[in-house]
Amino acid sequence: MVKVAILGASGGVGQPLSLLLKLSPYVSELALYDIRAAEGIGKDLSHINTNSSCVGYDKDSIENTLSNAQVVLIPAGVPRKPGLTRDDLFKMNAGIVKSLVTAVGKFAPNARILVISNPVNSLVPIAVETLKKMGKFKPGNVMGVTNLDLVRAETFLVDYLMLKNPKIGQEQDKTTMHRKVTVIGGHSGETIIPIITDKSLVFQLDKQYEHFIHRVQFGGDEIVKAKQGAGSATLSMAFAGAKFAEEVLRSFHNEKPETESLSAFVYLPGLKNGKKAQQLVGDNSIEYFSLPIVLRNGSVVSIDTSVLEKLSPREEQLVNTAVKELRKNIEKGKSFILDSSKL
């Protein structure tokens, strides 16, 4: 069985994520960490009658949290709020993630690190560069969790099909739409690229197709607006993060993944088919991209590039737009580590 640590367990994503992973049959020990309230949350969850143990640790006990952890999820950070610029958000969360990943490199160097904190496009490069400097980086062990984009794509695709053609819409099952749609690229705005793999559904959507793309890309804004500035996606993010973590955990047992085309934002140069992926997106120097992954024993062993080999002209446009924006996001993360090392 597997010890899982959640860093940032008291937050809006961290609490429901902790609950969902306490329910997982693949977890034997759940360790919760935050700067406040994690001990109480751990005690609360420990009363649930599943077979995993659960302990919450205070801000001075990160070594105990991480000791022997095989999977570490990082939802820690400041959420999107009105009046907070993206740059403000980045600076705060960049420092938090750098500090936590440094601790993982020190106390759990072989752990698989799942980055949930935003902005994923910049924070995953920070995690990678931090581990590189420590001499602890393993390319298959760092994954940016972009699964919420797929969860939204599955939901919204059925919603739009119901609007356009109720008969076809009623035939669909939102829980298995990952067989007909995947999402690649990055994890913000126009870097998010929904790919409908069942092209007959593109035809069915007709003019709703562009609305579908936009809604998947900017679905998070709906939640910020609906919560009237009091928060962003937390429950749906926790669900998507738990689903992704469960696939990583299943791979420790050599079980077949439940989600077809499960994507993650990964470091391409260190992975099998990474170079091929760079060529197919038209940029041999792009270091990170979210693509379907192949997991073994909790780590990414290769990338599935097949989705890139049969793109429509419109999808190629989406990839080109995403790559331009991703380059800036990635550079921002790398520069943060470079600049902080000069201080």
From Swiss-Prot:
Q: Which domain of life is it from?
A: Eukaryota
A molecular function annotated in GO for this UniProt entry is: mRNA binding
Q: What is its EC number?
A: 1.1.1.37
List residues binding substrate: R80, R86, N118, R152
| Pfam families per record | Ldh_1_C (PF02866), Ldh_1_N (PF00056)
Q: Which residues are involved in binding NAD(+)?
A: G8, A9, S10, G11, G12, V13, G14, D34, N93, I116, S117, N118, M237
Summarize subunit and interaction data from the UniProt record for this chain.
Homodimer.
Its recorded name reads Malate dehydrogenase, peroxisomal
Which taxonomic lineage is given here?
A: Eukaryota, Fungi, Dikarya, Ascomycota, Saccharomycotina
Q: Which gene encodes it?
A: MDH3
